[in-house]
Amino acid sequence: MLKRILLTGLAAALATLGTAGIGHAEPDRGVVVLVPGQYLGALPYEPLAAALRAEGYDTVVLDLKGFDIAADAHAIDGAVAAARGAHPGQPVSLVGHSIGALSSRYYLRELGGSAVVERYVAIGAPQYGSPGACGQPAAPEACPGTPFMAALNAGDDTPGATTYYSIRSEREWSDGRLDGGQCRLTPFRTLGNGGADHSLEPVLPAVLDQLRSALADDCAGEYVDEPDGAITADSTLFPSGIPFG
């Protein structure tokens, strides 16, 4: 039943987003690299990419499955290098959804990406891990408390000159906080279930609106600079107080 509801909602949201905010392209505003969530691939992100292209962003959607965070980070490295080569001098924004936000942050932190990426926008990101990853065959390293997650979150979560943004719904299962400087956009209104919110984020007009703000360096929420080590995995989970709801 839930799968059918999500598919129906996805189709409706795609239809809405497909007509939202798309007109004549504006002058070149930089490069956007979109990194999908687990299992999704590129297709659900194409309407979002089309909307950004119409607003003047040279947008690339990566076709990654999110099964291996470090491997995906190396793919992101290659994609960003290619985008910079194709658009010399243009700022690069890296936008990751769900586990795609983790592979994007691994790239920024471990592969030198923070030296070349101007802004990082995480959508529905389990930055300190997700219980849903525990015991699954795909990217089990995203389970809270694994050595991988401990290493990813050791020291400064927001290194370099990159600016860091977080987008999530009111009932997201993980609040997406990072220590160091981060803009936390005001959580958008829930559809009624955090899991549904999370799955549909790539095609929700509310997410597009907040992404526009982030790409324009407008912190439509709260800028927070938490000290290193102030965040624990448990403190990031179920900020609405409704587990898995």
Where are these regions (language model features)?
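Serine-dependent carboxylesterase/thioesterase catalytic core
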Residues: 27-36, 43, 51-64, 70-157
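Helical cap/lid subdomain of alpha/beta-hydrolase-fold lipid enzymes
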Residues: 109-245
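Structural motif
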Residues: 37-38, 169
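Secretory targeting and sorting signals
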Residues: 1-25
